């Protein structure tokens, strides 16, 4: 059997064993899956106990010290502080088994929760706007450049523009670059003669 087919058969065997093993997982009862519900809004944290208090009082403890007692299954912690309010929270209804939760949360008054799709949308829109502005600037500068420099080359003009520019007088010579007179015996006039 070629080695390619061997790997395919081995892969199918592993997949079937994995699927067969998943069927044997026991599903826990709904009673054992009860969990706390934690809601954070601004600097407030609301804990909801998985037990219903029915007609008895519910006792809330933090680090095994009683902090709250009510007939509701939730507790609201206002002005939550990560340092002061973090710890193990337990809720107990009467003499029933208590549920434990370790809570450590960072909160702030003016925080806004942003989901992943909002962040991706903001980034994509920002990139599109930036590219759009880049293209507008490119095409605008390209069209202005074409209007500013007309390319007209005539056969007899030698590549120079025609019209009024042709009648323009030559530029005024700069006094710093005056030509050396033949009557002067300066350093530069001597160098010039040796070079010939």
Swiss-Prot record:
Residue intervals of the ITAM domain: 167-194
Keyword flag Membrane: yes
GO CC aspect terms: alpha-beta T cell receptor complex; external side of plasma membrane
Cytoplasmic side: 138-196
Membrane topology of the entry: Single-pass type I membrane protein
UniProt keyword annotation of Phosphoprotein present: yes
Protein's cellular compartments: Cell membrane
Segments forming domain Ig-like: 28-102
Region called NUMB-binding region, residue ranges: 164-181
Protein's recorded name: T-cell surface glycoprotein CD3 epsilon chain
Modified residues (Phosphotyrosine): 177, 188
Residues passing through the membrane, by range: 117-137
InterPro entries documented for this protein: CD3_esu/gsu/dsu, Ig-like_dom, Ig-like_dom_sf, Ig-like_fold, Ig_sub2, Phos_immunorcpt_sig_ITAM
Species, as recorded: Sus scrofa (Pig)
Annotated segments matching region Proline-rich sequence: 168-175
Post-translational modification (record): Phosphorylated on Tyr residues after T-cell receptor triggering by LCK in association with CD4/CD8.
Cystine pairs: 49-91
Secretion signal, residue range per the UniProt entry: 1-21
Positions of the UniProt region annotated as Disordered: 150-196
Keywords, comma-separated and alphabetical: Adaptive immunity, Cell membrane, Disulfide bond, Immunity, Immunoglobulin domain, Membrane, Phosphoprotein, Receptor, Signal, Transmembrane, Transmembrane helix
Function: Part of the TCR-CD3 complex present on T-lymphocyte cell surface that plays an essential role in adaptive immune response. When antigen presenting cells (APCs) activate T-cell receptor (TCR), TCR-mediated signals are transmitted across the cell membrane by the CD3 chains CD3D, CD3E, CD3G and CD3Z. All CD3 chains contain immunoreceptor tyrosine-based activation motifs (ITAMs) in their cytoplasmic domain. Upon TCR engagement, these motifs become phosphorylated by Src family protein tyrosine kinases LCK and FYN, resulting in the activation of downstream signaling pathways.
Side Extracellular, residues: 22-116
SMART domains linked to this entry: IGc2, ITAM
Any one GO molecular function term: transmembrane signaling receptor activity
Subunit structure: The TCR-CD3 complex is composed of a CD3D/CD3E and a CD3G/CD3E heterodimers that preferentially associate with TCRalpha and TCRbeta, respectively, to form TCRalpha/CD3E/CD3G and TCRbeta/CD3G/CD3E trimers. In turn, the hexamer interacts with CD3Z homodimer to form the TCR-CD3 complex. Alternatively, TCRalpha and TCRbeta can be replaced by TCRgamma and TCRdelta. Interacts with CD6. Interacts (via Proline-rich sequence) with NCK1; the interaction is ligand dependent but independent of tyrosine kinase activation.
